[in-house]
């Protein structure tokens, strides 16, 4: 039983046509004899034959695992049968059974031999040994290279719309629901009768009054925002009618901050925990004194003939952005009209600076405390890096074709972003270019979060799937391939570390959040209950 290369070319050509890849099919048609085969076999080969053959090969590889060396059927492992067996795992098993011939000795290619002879001096020998050591360290750092880990759900949550983990306690999760209630929960692994399982214990319920929204008149009052202070001792909750409440980590109410009249979209604490800034969907931004609960500044930016002013009773205009950020204990930035970013001091009513460059609403603002640079992302599909005292961006990254939903710093020289165009991109400030790329065609990304240690990046797709990318492994491969060279010819693929799929169709994801240890992710779904998955 065999298949020729020309027959395989024909099946690939048929597959390209069936999937609508017309350009690829045309290229294959020009370079092979597929049209001759099509005349002979078109009526006898059904649709999807190539996929069917690959699936049968995967099944054959798995069935081989169930038969021992003597030909007897092995005992069935229920846990093994419940797991997904995919193409990557089948190829890995085949590679272990039939390893490739090493290119050494008489199997070494002539070109390799010549290059080895040309590089026999001491310096080049040391360089080759260093490169080999780097490659070996990469391979040994991931024993399951090629495998995609399937994440397991450990705890079911209620029908949540947002969630955030305590920044210092890896077991405490705050999550908000549609019924104006947020909850503080502790999630720990326990041991009972020799079996380990995860247990969720409710610490407190953080309740808002069930009131109508002042702007929309909606009868719902769901929790739209949650924000822990940097020391993890306090949390702010925001709801649809604009009310903010301040709580301690045991659930005791500390203060009620009531000035907004529209759903809250962003809340940020300053480093010392004395002030917060909040923003609602009507572009109203308020600076609060946390200790007294009083309003220190009130900004309501709108466009009037190309300029921005503070206006009263402003509503109905388009969103200027959905994020705010502190750049110091007494300085912060907020979105302004026409894609501008305004810089304010807590003691000044007028802006002290204006950053111009974006041409759409601001979706992300994130300040790096180490290099003192501000990262911004916009619905115009661009990311920009700003340096204090300069109104023009020092870096501008183009590549996304739709709105950017998440952007984060990866160390001091790189930023990672994801967009509704389905792509995840890693950028370098020093080289001012794209370093790595991952694209899932046709599936928009709704959320993205980086782990606290910066080693993994989780993205949530519209179809309910969560992908976790391995940034640590990507960084190692990048150093091995390019070293300290400035030129990057082609972006690297971003290694996929793990994946998790919703069990319900058409169940997109509202929100993601990492715990501080980087070993758990909370997921908020549109239809079913929320989940906590273990990494």
UniProtKB/Swiss-Prot annotation:
Residues 4-36 form the LisH domain. Keywords: Chromatin regulator, Nucleus, Phosphoprotein, Repeat, WD repeat. Disulfide bonds: none annotated. Residues 130-140 have a biased composition (Acidic residues). One of its GO terms (biological process) is cellular response to starvation. The keyword Phosphoprotein applies. GO terms for cellular component: nucleus; Rpd3L-Expanded complex; Set3 complex. WD repeats lie at residues 155-186, 218-248, 259-289, 316-345, 357-387, 399-428, 440-470, 503-534. The modification Phosphoserine is found at residue 137. Residues 104-140 are annotated as: Disordered. Its main location: nucleus. GO terms for molecular function: transcription corepressor activity. It is found in: Nucleus. SUPFAM superfamilies: WD40 repeat-like. Signal peptide: none annotated. PANTHER family: F-BOX-LIKE_WD REPEAT-CONTAINING PROTEIN EBI, WD40 REPEAT PROTEIN. Antagonizes telomeric silencing in yeast. May recruit SIR4 to non-telomeric sites or repression. Homotetramer. Interacts with SIR4 N-terminal domain. Interacts with a complex composed of SIN3 and RPD3. Identified in the Set3C complex with HOS2, HST1, SNT1, CPR1, HOS4/YIL112W and SET3. Present with 1620 molecules/cell in log phase SD medium. This is SIR4-interacting protein SIF2. It comes from Saccharomyces cerevisiae (strain ATCC 204508 / S288c). The lineage of its organism: Eukaryota, Fungi, Dikarya, Ascomycota, Saccharomycotina. The gene is SIF2.
């Amino acid at each position: 039983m065999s298949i020729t290369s020309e027959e395989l070319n024909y099946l690939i050509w048929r597959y390209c046509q069936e999937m609508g890849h017309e350009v690829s099919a045309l290229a294959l048609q020009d370079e092979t004899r597929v049209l001759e085969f099509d005349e002979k076999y078109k009526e006898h080969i059904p649709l999807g034959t190539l996929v069917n053959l690959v699936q049968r090969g995967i099944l054959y590889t798995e069935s081989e695992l169930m038969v021992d060396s003597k030909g007897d059927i092995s005992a069935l492992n229920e846990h093994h049968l419940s797991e997904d067996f995919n193409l990557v795992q089948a190829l890995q098993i085949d590679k272990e059974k039939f390893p490739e011939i090493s290119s050494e000795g008489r199997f070494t290619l002539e070109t390799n031999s010549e290059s080895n002879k040309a590089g026999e001096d001491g310096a080049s020998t040391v360089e080759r040994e260093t490169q080999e050591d780097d490659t070996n360290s990469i391979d040994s750092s991931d024993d399951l290279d090629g495998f995609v880990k399937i994440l397991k759900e450990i705890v079911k949550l209620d029908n949540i719309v947002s969630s955030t983990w305590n920044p210092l306690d890896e077991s405490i999760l705050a999550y908000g629901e549609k019924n104006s209630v947020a909850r503080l929960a502790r999630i720990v692994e326990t041991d009972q009768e020799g079996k380990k399982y995860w247990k969720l214990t409710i610490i407190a319920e953080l309740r808002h009054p069930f009131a109508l929204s002042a702007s929309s008149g909606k009868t719902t009052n769901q929790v739209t925002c949650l924000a822990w202070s940097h020391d993890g001792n306090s949390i702010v909750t925001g709801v649809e009618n604009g009310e903010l409440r301040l709580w301690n980590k045991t659930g005791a109410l500390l203060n009620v901050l009531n000035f907004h009249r529209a759903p809250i979209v962003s809340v940020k604490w300053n480093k010392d925990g004395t002030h917060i800034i909040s923003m609602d969907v009507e572009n109203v931004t308020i600076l609060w004194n946390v200790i007294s609960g009083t309003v220190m500044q009130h900004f309501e930016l709108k466009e009037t003939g190309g300029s921005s002013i503070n206006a009263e009773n402003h509503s109905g205009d388009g969103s200027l952005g959905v994020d705010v950020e502190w750049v110091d204990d007494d300085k912060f930035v907020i979105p302004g009209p026409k894609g501008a970013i305004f810089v304010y001091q807590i003691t000044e009513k007028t802006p002290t600076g204006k950053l111009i460059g974006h041409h759409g609403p601001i979706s992300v603002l994130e300040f790096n405390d180490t290099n003192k640079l501000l990262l911004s992302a916009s619905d115009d599909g661009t990311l920009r890096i700003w340096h204090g005292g300069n109104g023009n961006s020092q870096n501008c990254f183009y590549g996304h074709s739709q709105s950017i939903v998440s952007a984060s710093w990866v160390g001091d020289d790189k930023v990672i972003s994801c967009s509704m165009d389905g792509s995840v991109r890693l950028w370098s400030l020093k080289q001012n270019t794209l370093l790595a790329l991952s694209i899932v065609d046709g599936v928009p990304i709704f959320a993205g979060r980086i782990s606290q240690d910066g080693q993994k990046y989780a993205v949530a797709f519209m179809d309910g799937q969560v992908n976790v990318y391995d940034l640590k492994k990507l960084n190692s491969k990048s150093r091995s391939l390019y070293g300290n060279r400035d030129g990057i010819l082609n972006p690297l693929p971003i290694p996929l570390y793990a994946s998790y799929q919703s069990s319900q169709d058409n169940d997109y994801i509202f929100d993601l959040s990492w715990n501080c240890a980087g070993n758990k992710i909370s997921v908020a779904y549109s239809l079913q209950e929320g989940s906590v998955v273990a990494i």
